[in-house]
C-alpha cells in the first residue's frame, strides 16, 4: 500500500482544458511512490503511467454521487438558484451562483468520500485537476507537507471576507481518528443535505469544508499551509493567492 495517494476528478471539458496536462505533469515530476486515483466523468484521459495513476469511471465508481445528482438535479437551490430563499436571495452576492451550486461541486467531494472509504493509503490528498506540477516533487518534500501528528492539512485564507479554505489541495491522515470523524461528518452534510449543506449560508465545497473545520477547532491537529503568509485582513488575507504564494507554490 502506498503511503500517500492523491485523488482528483474532472469531466470532459475539464480533461480538454487542464486535466490531461495535470496528469502528464504529475507522472513526469512527482515521485513514483506517490500514487493517484482519478475519477473521470464521462471522458477517457490518456494514462501517462498506469503504475502510478489509476483511472476510474465516475459513473461506475461513485454510486453515491449519482444518487445525489439524481435526488437534487431538478431542485433550483441545488443548482445555484436561491431566488426562492427569502433570506439568501437578498444577499448582495446572490448572483454568484457558484456559491450555491451543490451539484457542480458534488463531483469533488464524492470523489474524496469514495477514496476515503477505500482506504488506499495512510494519507489521502485532494488536488484540483486544474493544477500543474512545474517542478520535480520528491517523496520527502511531499511527505514533509503531511506531518503524522496532524489529522488534516489545508490552505487557509486568513481573516478576510473569503474565510473558507482554498480547497485546491488538502491532506487527510487516515491513521488519525479525528480525520475519520471529520470526513464522516463532511459526507453526512451531503447525504442528509436538507439538514446539512442546505442549512448553511453557502453550499459550495470549500464553504462546507470550512464549516466542518470550525467545529473541530477545539482539537489540536490541523495544519494551515498559509497561516504565516497573512499580513493584514483582506480578501486574500493580505499575502496574495494562498496556493501560489505558500509552500505549495514551489512545485
How would you describe each model-predicted region?
Residues 1-94, 117-121, 174, 247-251:
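N-terminal anchoring/stem segment of glycosyltransferases
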Residues 13-17, 102-106, 200-203:
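Conserved phosphate-coordination/catalytic loops
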Residues 20, 106-110, 203-211:
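A structural signal for well-ordered alpha-helical segments within the folded catalytic domains
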Residues 90-99, 195:
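Short glycine/proline- and acidic residue-enriched helix-loop micro-motifs
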Residues 100, 104-154:
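GT-A fold catalytic core of metal-dependent nucleotide-sugar glycosyltransferases
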Residues 108, 127, 165-168, 205:
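Residues that flank catalytic or metal-binding motifs in active/ligand-binding sites
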Residues 134-202:
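Conserved catalytic core of nucleotide-sugar-dependent glycosyltransferases
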Residues 172-251:
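Catalytic core and acceptor-binding pocket of nucleotide-sugar-dependent glycosyltransferases
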